[in-house]
Amino acid sequence: MTIKHTQDLAQIRAMVPEMRRVKAIHFIGIGGAGMSGIAEVLLNEGYQISGSDLAANAVTDRLADKGATIFIGHEAHNVAHASVVVVSTAINEQNPEIQAAREKRIPIVRRAEMLAELMRFRHGIAVAGTHGKTTTTALVTQIYSEAGLDPTFVNGGLVKSAGTNARLGSSRILIAEADESDASFLHLQPMVTIVTNIEADHMDTYGGDFENLKQTFIDFLHNLPFYGQAILCIDDPVIRELIPRVSRQVITYGFSEDADVRIENYRQNGQQGQFTVVRKGKANLDITLNIPGRHNALNAAAAIAVATEDDIRDEAILRAMANTQGTGRRFDHLGEFETGNGVAMLVDDYGHHPTEVDVTIKAARNGWAEKRLVMIFQPHRYTRTRDLYDDFANVLEQVDVLIMLDVYAAGEKPIAGADGRSLCRTIRSRGKIDPIFVPDSQTLPSVLANILQDGDLVLTQGAGDVGKVARHLAALELNIGRMQQI
């Protein structure tokens, strides 16, 4: 089912009071997934929304169509009429809009603080973890929508069935992705929290101390009220280690024998996964999940655990799993194309951590074992490439053909030896595959044209602008003749 939306602003106002004296809200970096989602919900709640970003995109265009004022570029006068300014973590203190807001004594809040305000008068369901947050948030949203509960949701990526990454619903339920990258999720005070897994990522935030990261997750779980619920993946060794330190009700899920919500008999058939979910005191569920991979079965089990605790009908759960369209850039099937030399399949995926890349490769192998796997990989951030260098090399050498783009810096300065060329050299020296380094993504189509074979699965992978490369390849329909002309 496509997620439907009904709302009555007067009804919502009765549940969620207006922020006192706040009329106009300005977002610096409004084009990002997390920022735009909050902006869209607040816009639909009746606030005057403005925002700025360095470039227009589909998100800013949609917000403008809905009535937001969008500025391209950051200028001091953009905040002239703001009651409050919301900033993303990507914005530094030298930004002229931040400086102007400080001079005018306009309150400046982080994205998570505004999300916390949205959650304050609602039944909040927060989804945290190193991997799987976006898909799990979408699956929870799909279930509650199938059950007719019309939730508000704010996700870090496109919920395909809704056609947006955020929406204001008419019920008191708010489902939100919680971001640990800057520890700002500590502002949130949900009723239910899912934690999918905990790995070393964004370690600059935590002083390079993994114990600090683990304690921050514990602190986040203790933001739950005493009657709240922690839905935790017991397959994850770090989470299993931390469970005794969680002083809230814990419900576990996973493939493990001791999981409260247990996955059995997983098998994959192309784009679909099929498995049984065993629940304590409830009937088993035979699930058909319309997105591939064991990792997505875990994401589904988390959503099912939450829904089961909320007494949502099994029929709604089963429909949601079978009908989900997934999320944007998560094993996103862009098509199968006649290339001029046979047929090739194109998939785009956002995964940019070695664990995420690994599970994507496994999903591709399990669903399309006969296909040659051609990966176009773009490392994301020099610090991540440096910190997880060997892990990246170990994972990337599993593909059949590797085309490597250079690092998407995301504002970071280059780090010697932590770039695409170095990673290629390391992988090549191991002798399993011979990676191809492409420093300019504009030349990639012509490089791919000389490699493509009948039956290939082409997988674009990464969190930077490689998604645009994927869309360009789809527009070219992987046609060898057209790609050679680029």
From Swiss-Prot:
Localisation per UniProt entry: Cytoplasm
GO molecular function: ATP binding; UDP-N-acetylmuramate-L-alanine ligase activity
Gene3D superfamilies linked to this entry: Mur ligase, C-terminal domain, Mur-like, catalytic domain, NAD(P)-binding Rossmann-like Domain
UniProt cross-references to Pfam families, sorted A to Z: Mur_ligase, Mur_ligase_C, Mur_ligase_M
Annotated EC: 6.3.2.8
GO biological process: cell division; cell wall organization; peptidoglycan biosynthetic process; regulation of cell shape
UniProt: ATP binding residues: 129-135
Keyword Cell division: yes
Top-rank taxon: Bacteria
Reaction equation(s) it catalyzes: UDP-N-acetyl-alpha-D-muramate + L-alanine + ATP = UDP-N-acetyl-alpha-D-muramoyl-L-alanine + ADP + phosphate + H(+)
Alphabetically ordered keywords of this record: ATP-binding, Cell cycle, Cell division, Cell shape, Cell wall biogenesis/degradation, Cytoplasm, Ligase, Nucleotide-binding, Peptidoglycan synthesis
Record's keyword annotation contains tRNA processing: no
GO cellular component terms listed in the entry, alphabetical order: cytoplasm
HAMAP family associated with the record: MurC
Family note: Belongs to the MurCDEF family.
PANTHER family, per the entry: UDP-N-ACETYLMURAMATE--L-ALANINE LIGASE, UDP-N-ACETYLMURAMATE--L-ALANINE LIGASE-RELATED
Stated role: Cell wall formation.
Protein name according to UniProt: UDP-N-acetylmuramate--L-alanine ligase
Lineage start: Bacteria, Pseudomonadati, Pseudomonadota, Gammaproteobacteria, Vibrionales
Recorded name of the encoding gene: murC
